[in-house]
Amino acid sequence: MFEKRPKLFKNRDVLSPLFVPDTLQDRKEEVGAISQYLGYILDGATPPHLLIVGPPGSGKTVTTKYVINELEKHTSDAVIEYIVADGTAYQVATSIARAPRRGLGFLNIVEKIRERASEGKMIIVMDEIDKTLSRDGDKLLYHLSREPNVCIVGLSNKLTVMDMIGDSGVISSFKPRRISFAPYSAPQLEEILNYRVEMAFNDGVLEDDVVPLCAALAAQRNGDARYALDLLSFAADIAIRQLKGVVSESDVRMATDEVEVEFIRRSIEQLRDNQKILLYAVMTSQGGTPTEIYRKYNKMAEEQFGGNALTQRRLSQLLRELELYGLVEIEVVGRGRGRGVNWHVVPSSSIDPDLMLEAIRRSL
């Protein structure tokens, strides 16, 4: 059984989105900005709070981890904690404090964080910070942002994540420096893949057109590097399953169906409920003007999902976020009389609508 498996991989883990390379392709400007701010800790100063935003797969996490790894080579005094902030304020606080999740009150946990910070300057990286803010994360941010020795580095797919902070006191004390990540281009994705291919695969097991095709398809998915890596690893899995010694373009084409399902599931999971309802409205109305989508959304939110109506301005912001994630396309169709451009919103032409609708229904 196992003897017949082709030996394509040297190290399959290199294709994981969790892998942090020794060197980064592109993102030099973002590395420079993050390292400049966090580097103040080497001078004995607390770095300013940072907010790193960009669409999924744009390199926020891997870039931040890369800079943190480099920083740790130059200091042993800093207390650095990386967490995925996808829980309640209490759950996130216990992770930062490394405290048990039972038996202590919230303020007791905050005090333990203070004790850790007193050991030296503390950097807290909160990946997916929007998820805790969508619950009760305000109250944790309230305390952390007021600690003189604490630097908060928040990562989010949401461009408007600051709008999720309802406490004006938190907004005043947090005031992060914002660093934005743009989607990767096809050439950038190809460079990323080529770097990892050298470590991941044995020589000569990829046909020449495999990497360019993975990069081109991922560029159509709003430049998502994780999608490109998934395509490459799934294609290799298919080749191994078919007992082939080489990964071909046809394997990549076959892998798109498997990766599509995973991509859609992951894309929907990272949306807030109001974004899911809005996307559902776009999908079921087959597109239309923002006004038409606005009416459809409010009707669905009230009648079907028990949600609250949004202002048209806020709804337009959410549509722009969905466009950034590659889930919808906004088409300019002409100019109105004295009212600027007219535009329509349609589902992404690169995503299977039936798979998308099913994923939304399952998540709501």
UniProtKB/Swiss-Prot annotation:
Which residues make up the binding site for ATP?
58-62, 184, 196
Entry annotated with the keyword Nucleotide-binding: yes
One GO term under biological process is:
DNA replication
Short name of any one Pfam family annotated for the protein: AAA_22
The keyword Nucleotide-binding is assigned to this record: yes
Q: Which family does it belong to?
A: Belongs to the CDC6/cdc18 family.
Name used for this protein in its record: ORC1-type DNA replication protein
